[in-house]
Curated annotation (Swiss-Prot):
UniProt-recorded Gene Ontology molecular function terms: DNA binding; DNA-directed RNA polymerase activity; magnesium ion binding
Biological process annotations from GO: DNA-templated transcription
Top-level taxon: Eukaryota
Annotated GO CC locations: chloroplast; DNA-directed RNA polymerase complex; mitochondrion
Family: Belongs to the RNA polymerase beta' chain family. RpoC1 subfamily.
Binding site for Mg(2+): D804, D806, D808
The organism of origin for this protein: Oltmannsiellopsis viridis (Marine flagellate)
Sequence ranges of Polar residues compositional bias: 161-176
Record's protein name: DNA-directed RNA polymerase subunit beta'
Length: 1021
């Protein structure tokens, strides 16, 4: 009979199954992932979402972090949707399907409202974004931080609609760029029976707080012109005070047969931030005639417009004049206008129509929230405004309660987002806009007015007679359907500029070719100027400045060309340097740890992520409010704050940016701070592991070592080579057992060092100094036993290790196998690593102590020499021999012929009672016949290391006697002459034949020369 019930057996089997699943998961983690290579590059927003998003069993897609909260500090449980959310990053406890190790690898992401530039590519030296765009770095940073805009004409014409024909379908689409940054197309149908198929159309201009002055159109005789109708005259006047002028001017219409629309509009007169007067020039007033307005009810219940056209709604001809007389202000989402605050105003608009142009659809809309715009049944292509045009289809369900029911009298239509479907329009992208961002900045005009005219021409709308250019058929659009020249500041503007350099575009090769042609032009101009120097011609200061400027421009162009080629080769897209999706690290890499008591330690990354989310939500509220992306100062300031928050997260305080600190004024550690440096993630946790047969000690200079040798302390050598030493002792029958060999080693017998020298003779060691930045950071050396506890190193190999002798430490590694030792001798032996693998230049260059020592040996003590010479001259009396300026020799060619025993026959050179100073004063100008005599006098302290002497020289030497005049020429009675120069002396006979030559030198230079000669003669390295 079984001891347990079936239920118990089932539960036991379930527990065993769970343990088996957990064991498999742990085993899979312990196996690890074998990575062959890693390439660092740019990640697209789609790739980041792919890394972070995952689908739950119920079909919910999670991964986006929307809540800035981390955990509940009372229960320490993660907040839903926050930076420690269990749905996004994994469970905090082991379950049947997952373990807590998932929280070390799962990413999240933050969807940014406005794109921001990556600080590594913006503020680095050099700035890759500035190089690629060929713009000054300060201007690119100003645009990124929303302190500068790309161009004013783009902002003025952002509400301009365009009508682009589609010859294949016989239809055309006009799109209006509203304040929200989303297109609201209106579909119209063209009559194929007429030749006049389209005309240039404009939406009603809108005033924002940043728009203070708009131009008046003075010439109304043109058929096509921008419609800029009013000026802002005063902020102190209300529309109520100007109501009479507005209504009087609105009754003026053209005298031709035109369609005249009348509309009644409610205005919010108490919440106006600007007021304006309509002003018309004298030339325009002649085009107006008075006409009695059509009768229409003016009661507050009338919210629709009346039409004074005929039944067919068409016209016989097109008027050459057009006008549009109304005002507007930003759409306000909150606060409806109360009945007591409403003021009824009547206005009219007049506009021409093409023959045969009929409307395909009519929209019935209601007034927006506090908007100063005409509402009602609008069958016009002018002034059409959809209060829901900022919403997309997938946003309707999530924003059902965004709008409230209006309080207008007798309002029968609802104004909620549920009616968004009735206002939906098909998206159209069949229009063309000139792209002026690809124009080189070197072609800019110096005059701002000329530049504005050029931008106005390039940003003008499409005419019906325009034909599309084949090269621009595949124009790249943003994901929102807008052309990439819409944003004028912030990261979105930089991203749209970088879209021109997308490798998938065909014209990127044209840009590269253009840069190559510009580089060739610079090379040609540089060669012309350099040829002047080669031919020995004189180069003026202006030409020299031009040459330096051309060198700088060529370097800049080549750097840009190299960057463009890199993007083409790697297939990376430059717009990925602008972040629209920000990845969030796994929570276990930025933990929250509970300390003793109620204290909690929070990683700095959590605070930086929170600041990014807070500012992103702030910008989202502004985007849903009354502020536009380009024109609102509030929106630009919010974008700048978001940019600074992301910069602080990636690299806090980089490039002189604002540093985010904690309550103790300590800068928070960013992602870059956690990666770089000695305490960074790589060097602290991933590198520098302990290995066997290795040691570490301080390095000191060993000038007597050869280049491939290093001094190894005896204490370290005993420990590192103990197995080899024991084997050698047993092989030589010195010790019978391993225990006996170890006992002999501990005794420190003299025979141990002899055997150890034999072991080290054919066994290299590897020296390494961290950080190992290139392959020369680890080299093989022949060890030599030295006393002490420091490693001796030849000073010439220090540049390869970037080492000096101020306390640096180096690690010693012992290659064990024969293969490792053979590779050490052949590949990384120090005497074979003479040239740098990066530049090909010699890397074994003298530096620091060696240069200082050589300088000290070869320098001259001119001040001391002059004082001793003057002292010796003052003691001379009745000298019949005239002096050779300052270099008059006391004994030498003028007194008697120099012989081999010149120094021995001089005045008291070896006198024991003379001091070194007196001997030096006497022999400061002495002549010596050989280098050995000079060194002998130096070792007897008769000369100092820097004493100037004359040395007889039998070999040739380099002298500047061709361009140098002798200081003095002396001729004796026999015709023999002596020519004295600054650093040499010649004696000729009467026939002009050279008898002797002397060079002026010092004992230190002679000592250095002999050392170098001996080294070269013995072929030592």
């Amino acid at each position: 009979m079984p001891t347990g019930s079936p239920v118990d057996a089932t539960e036991g089997s379930n527990h065993s199954t769970r343990r088996g699943v957990l064991k498999k998961r742990v085993a899979s983690f312990s196996n690890g992932i074998h990575i062959k290579s890693i390439r660092i590059g740019l990640a697209s927003p789609e790739r980041i979402r792919q890394w972070a998003e995952r689908v739950l069993p119920d079909g919910t897609v999670v991964g986006q972090v929307t809540n800035p909260q981390t955990v509940n500090y009372k229960t320490l449980k993660p907040e839903k949707g926050g930076l420690f959310c269990e749905q996004i990053f994994g469970s905090i406890q082991d379950t049947d399907l997952t373990t807590t190790r998932d929280r070390r690898s799962r990413l999240g992401y933050i969807q940014l409202v406005s794109p921001v530039t990556h600080v590594w590519y913006l503020k680095a030296l050099p700035s890759y974004i500035a190089i690629l765009l060929d713009l000054p770095k300060k201007h690119v940073e100003s645009i990124s931080y929303c302190t500068e805009t790309l161009s004013v004409p783009v902002a003025v014409h952002q509400t301009t609609g365009t009508l682009a024909p589609n010859t294949s379908t016989g239809r055309a689409t006009t799109e209006t760029n509203g304040d929200r940054g989303h297109a609201s197309p209106i579909s119209v149908e063209l009559n194929p029976s007429t030749n006049q198929n389209s005309m240039e159309l404009f939406d009603a201009p809108r005033l924002t707080k940043s728009s203070s002055n708009l131009k008046l159109t003075s010439d109304l005789g043109k058929a096509k012109q921008p419609l800029l109708l009013w000026e802002s005259s005063s902020r102190s006047k209300w529309l109520r005070g100007n109501h009479g002028d507005f209504q009087a001017n609105s009754n003026l219409i053209f005298q031709l047969n035109e369609k005249c629309l009348w509309f009644n509009t409610f205005y919010n007169s108490l919440k106006l931030e600007k007021s304006w007067n309509l002003e018309f020039p004298e030339s325009a007033r002649n085009s107006f005639v008075k006409k009695k307005p059509s009768k229409s009810p003016t009661g507050p219940s009338n919210t629709s417009s009346g039409d004074s056209l005929g039944k067919d709604g068409t016209m016989d001809h097109v008027s050459p004049h057009k006008a549009n007389l109304w005002g507007s202000s930003p759409l306000k989402r909150e606060g409806w206008v109360k009945s007591a605050q409403q003021t009824l105003t009547q206005g009219s608009q007049s506009y021409p129509y093409a023959n045969g142009l009929s409307f395909n659809e009519g929209k019935s809309k209601e007034m927006g929230v506090g908007a100063l715009r005409p509402q009602g049944s609008e069958n016009s292509l002018f002034g059409t405004h959809d209060p829901f045009d900022h919403l997309s289809t997938h946003q309707v369900k999530s924003e059902q309660n965004l709008f409230k029911t209006p309080t207008f009298d007798n309002s029968k239509q609802s104004n909620t987002a549920e009616n968004r479907d009735s206002f939906s329009r098909t998206s159209a992208r069949s229009w063309i806009i000139n792209n002026y961002y690809s124009v080189l900045q070197t072609c800019r005009w110096k005059s701002p007015s000329d530049w504005d005219l050029f931008l106005f021409y390039m940003t003008s709308s499409v005419n019906s007679l325009d034909k599309p250019i084949p090269c621009y058929q595949n124009r790249i659009y943003d994901s929102s359907g807008l052309p990439f020249d819409f944003p004028i500041s912030g990261g979105a503007a930089i991203r749209n500029l970088l879209l021109n350099f997308d490798p998938v575009r065909e014209d990127l090769s044209l840009i590269a070719r253009q840069i190559e042609n510009q580089s060739a032009k610079y090379n040609q101009e540089i060669r012309v100027l350099e040829q002047l120097y080669v031919n020995g011609l004189f180069m003026t200061r202006t030409q020299r400045k031009v040459l330096f400027a051309l060198w700088r421009q060529r370097t800049k162009v080549l750097r840009r060309l190299k960057l463009v080629r890199y993007f083409r080769q790697t297939n990376m897209r430059p717009q990925w340097m602008v972040l629209s999706v920000l990845p969030v690290l796994p929570p276990d890499l930025r933990p929250i740890i509970q300390m003793n008591g109620n204290q909690v330690a929070v990683s700095d990354l959590n605070k930086l992520y929170q600041k990014v989310i807070f500012r992103n939500q702030r910008m989202l509220r502004f985007a849903r409010g009354q502020y536009t992306i380009n024109n609102s100062p509030e929106m630009r300031y919010a974008g700048r704050l978001l940019q600074e928050a992301v910069d602080a997260l990636i690299a806090n305080g980089k490039g002189g940016g604002a540093t985010i600190s904690d309550a103790n004024n300590r800068p928070l550690k960013s992602l870059s701070d956690m990666l770089k440096g000695k305490k960074g993630r790589f060097r602290q946790n991933l590198l520098g592991k302990r290995v066997d047969y290795s040691g570490r000690s301080v390095i000191v200079v060993g000038p007597k070592l050869k280049l491939h040798e290093c001094g190894l302390p005896k204490e370290m050598a005993i420990e590192l080579f103990q197995p080899f030493l024991i084997r050698q002792l047993r092989t030589n029958k010195i010790a019978a057992t391993i225990v006996g060999a170890k006992k002999l080693i501990r005794s420190g017998d003299q025979i141990i060092w002899e055997v150890l020298k034999q072991v080290l003779q054919n066994h290299p060691i590897l020296l390494n100094r961290a950080p190992t930045l290139h392959r020369l950071g680890i080299q093989a050396f022949q060890p030599k036993l030295v006393d002490g506890r420091a490693i001796l190193l030849h000073p010439l190999v220090c540049p390869a290790f970037n080492a000096d002798f101020d306390g640096d430490q180096m690690a010693v590694h012992v290659p064990l196998s024969y293969e490792a030792r053979s590779e050490a001798w052949k590949l990384i032996w120090a005497r074979n690593n003479i040239l740098s693998p990066a530049t090909g230049e010699p890397i074994l260059t003298p530096s620091q102590d060696m240069i200082l020592g050589c300088y000290y040996l070869t320098t001259t003590d001119r001040i001391r020499f002059k004082s001793t010479w003057l002292a010796s001259k003052s003691q001379q009396t009745g000298d019949s021999e005239a002096s050779f300026a300052m270099l008059r020799p006391k004994h030498g060619p003028s007194g008697r012929k120099p012989t081999q025993d010149l120094c021995t026959k001089g005045s008291a050179f070896f006198a024991p009672d003379n001091t070194a100073k007196q001997s030096e004063a006497s022999f400061a100008l002495s002549f010596f016949s050989s280098q050995e005599e000079v060194l002998l006098a130096y070792h007897h302290h008769k000369l100092s290391l820097h004493s100037l002497i004359w040395l007889k020289w039998e070999q040739d030497f380099e002298a500047n006697t061709t361009f140098e005049s002798p200081l003095e020429i002396r001729v004796d009675k026999n015709g023999n002459s002596t020519h004295l120069y600054r650093n040499n002396l010649y004696r000729f006979n009467s026939k002009g034949e050279k008898l002797q030559q002397f060079i002026r030198t010092t004992p230190g230079r002679i000592l250095l020369n002999q050392t170098i000669s001996q080294t070269l003669f013995t072929k030592q390295v």
